[in-house]
């Protein structure tokens, strides 16, 4: 395999292919081609940034003017608009508007969504009824609903992932020493 993601896909396929698991590459040209308009509107019109700026409710994640990275030959760097050009940070790569338009049309697989766009991209290529996430993911998914509304994309039901707390015997003894039990921990520090 040429990349870690390719190796993981092959490994998962070998392990679970008989169970009907489908493994695909979200960076494939065909999937990225399906979001060319999303890429264009973000890069040329800063649509997501404008939605964020006009919203009373701000996202917990910083929303950039351009929310895509450019990928090529091991490089994955932010795209920024500087005067009349688009530059790829930490590289010598730059595009005029016409060159960027051509690159989006010819090589959409080179555009990688950042954390803000990933949620939207994920729902556009493989819509889910429910998204199960950790505490931080739930918070930022909920703050991104306005972006889904802008693109008329289905917003999934957000469900917090179940979690568990394991108390070591040492911690258990410390709690007992102070006359506390597990429930006391969840009452907040001012109520202990």
Per-region residue spans from a language model:
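N-terminal targeting/trafficking signals and adjacent low-complexity tails
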Residues: 1-192
